[in-house]
From Swiss-Prot:
Its main location: cytoplasm. It comes from the Eukaryota. Keywords: Acetylation, Cytoplasm, Hydrolase, Magnesium, Metal-binding. PROSITE patterns: CYTH. It holds the Pfam family CYTH. Hydrolase highly specific for thiamine triphosphate (ThTP). Binds 1 Mg(2+) ion per subunit. InterPro entries: CYTH-like_dom_sf (IPR033469), CYTH_domain (IPR023577), THTPA (IPR039582), ThTPase_euk (IPR012177). GO terms for cellular component: cytoplasm. GO terms for biological process: thiamine diphosphate metabolic process; thiamine metabolic process. The modification N-acetylalanine is found at residue 2. Its EC number is 3.6.1.28. This is Thiamine-triphosphatase.
Length: 219
């Protein structure tokens, strides 16, 4: 699999004072934006059940989230993000046991791979960034996204992007530290927008994922 950045993240339920608290901590509001996300999978959810998440974001193109290191525990997740279409196509074919086509982007292989639209919704996002210093004095940029989906669900996410697995523990330390400063419960975990969408509007698909992940929320 072509290597991409490793995304380490933790989702949480934002409160009415979350943005104010981010300002107090020295955070900077980068932008407010509205976009549509569309997720694709097979009718059996072969990708999601294997912890792969294929998304097309309006204005940003395709992204495939691939599972990170095994054994990562706690109220956070770790994924490798692929955004180059040839890498995405190659990984999709590997997961689904298909031959890699000679040419064509993601859209061209949706039909041959049996991938169809599973969910589509609009999100309003406030994107923040801030720098935290760790116990070792090293500074790390963290991003905080505060999202409200068009079906009425609000969720926040603290995220760090790293280049190699060895950097993950330090990123987790910063994420946990910022989460505590924001008043997030230590073991609290908010479900992703997609999971809530499936639970509300495609309950049979939601049950398929529960069979695999139990009470653990993905992605």
């Amino acid at each position: 699999m072509a290597q991409g950045l490793i995304e380490v993240e933790r989702k949480f339920v934002p409160g009415p004072s979350t943005e104010e608290r981010l300002q107090e901590l020295g955070g900077t509001l980068e932008h407010r934006v509205t976009f549509r996300d569309s997720y694709y999978d097979t009718p059996e959810l072969s990708l999601m059940r294997a912890d792969y998440w294929l998304r097309q974001r309006e204005g940003s193109g395709w992204e495939l989230k691939c599972p990170g290191a095994a054994g990562v525990s706690g109220p956070h997740t770790e994924y490798t993000e692929l955004t180059a279409e040839p890498s995405i196509v190659a990984q999709l074919c590997e997961v689904l046991g298909a031959e890699v086509p000679g040419a064509g982007g993601v859209a061209a292989v949706l039909g041959p791979l049996g991938l169809q639209l599973v969910a589509s919704f609009v999100t309003k996002r406030s994107a923040w960034k801030l720098v935290l210093s760790g116990a070792d004095g090293e500074e790390r940029l963290l991003r905080v996204d505060l999202d409200t989906a068009d079906f009425g669900y609000a969720v926040g996410e603290v995220e760090a992007l790293v280049h190699k697995e060895a950097e993950v523990p330090a990123a987790l330390e910063k994420i946990h530290h910022l989460s505590s400063l924001l008043g997030v419960l230590e073991q609290g975990r908010a479900p992703a927008k997609l999971i809530v969408y499936l639970q509300r509007f495609r309950p049979q698909d939601y049950q398929r994922l529960l069979e695999v992940y139990g009470s653990k929320e993905k992605p």
